[in-house]
Amino acid sequence: MVLTVAQDRALPSGPFESSHRSLQSGLRAWVERRTHHPLGYVEQLYTFADRDRTEAGARVISISYLGLTRQVRAAEGDARWQGWYRYFPWEDHRAGTPSVRSQMIAPRLAAWAKGAPTPAARRERRQRAAMVFGLDGQGWNEELVLQRYELLYEAGMVPEATRRADPLCLSPLPGEPMLHDHRRILATGIARLRAKIKYRPVVFELMPPSFTLLQLQQCVEALAGQRMHKQNFRRLIEQQELVEETGQIATETGGRPAKLVRFRRAIQQERAFAGTKLPVTRAT
């Protein structure tokens, strides 16, 4: 889920003001003021400064952040929670390969590659399409969210590219557009989070104080956009000693009662250090 504003077409943002002690404190203040929703874990993501980032054409520099929070209550004002696959339907492989990839993206990228001016350019386009979208026998890499979006933009297959007057833009792919380059920023954040969940327990920020292992697995699957083998997932959680039992049972599971677990205190302490300015690293 992603917290949006402007009728679901933008990410929360605002100008840096002299009263803000730091960029991060300014971010937290703006997001909470705009959405009435406090942030937990925050890290700087990327600086966007390309030309023509806005319809007005003004040169705007944006410093983006990845912020995590639990959806403990409904957003307020014009802020609303939206599933991020609404903006990137080709990224959700939990029910298998999405039809938009095979039925729309693959053939249109093939046509785009064929339209390149030279044999070398045609070959380079085909190779890029195969690599980032897992075509022609290539494997799917869930972390290449930004590369996929940027390739579709370059090929003129997303609404944000219509300013370039490319003929392919007349029939954009499914997936809600966003204002300016906010969908590119969102793609960058999803890619960062998909990579980070593999080596840091940031998923802690998204879970309630106690939960079942199935709920944890479903959260990870929603982030990665892929199904995970139940027993392999639980074995990995046990090997890494991420959680401990609470001694309580969840009965409202829609099936058999399940044990409630929580993240171990050591994991929570690592989370506390992650947001500081100290260069804290994992022990080797």
Where are these regions (language model features)?
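Short, hydrophobic-biased segments on the C-terminal half of alpha helices
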Residues: 28, 233-237, 252
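Short helix-coil junctions and helix-kink-helix linkers
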Residues: 218-227
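Charge-enriched amphipathic alpha-helical scaffolds
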Residues: 227-246
